[in-house]
Each structure stands twice: as structure tokens, then as C-alpha cells.
């Protein structure tokens, strides 16, 4: 899931939260 981490930018807060859920 490293690609998702790179795609998650600081500006993208909403997608970042979803990414955290996916990782969890």
C-alpha cells in the first residue's frame, strides 16, 4: 500500500482518512 501512501497528499485529507481505514 506504499503507492496509496504516496498518492495521499496533505491537501487530500478526506482520501487520507479512507486510506487509514483501508490500512487499519
UniProtKB/Swiss-Prot annotation:
Effect of residue 9 to W: Elevated levels of aspartokinase 2
Superkingdom of the source species: Bacteria
Alphabetical UniProt keywords: Leader peptide
Biological role: Involved in the repression of the lysC operon which encodes aspartokinase 2.
Protein name: Aspartokinase II operon leader peptide
Organism: Bacillus subtilis (strain 168)
Gene, per the UniProt record: ask
Amino acid at each position: 500500500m506504499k503507492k496509496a501512501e504516496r498518492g495521499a497528499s496533505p491537501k487530500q485529507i478526506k482520501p487520507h482518512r479512507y486510506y487509514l481505514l483501508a490500512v487499519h
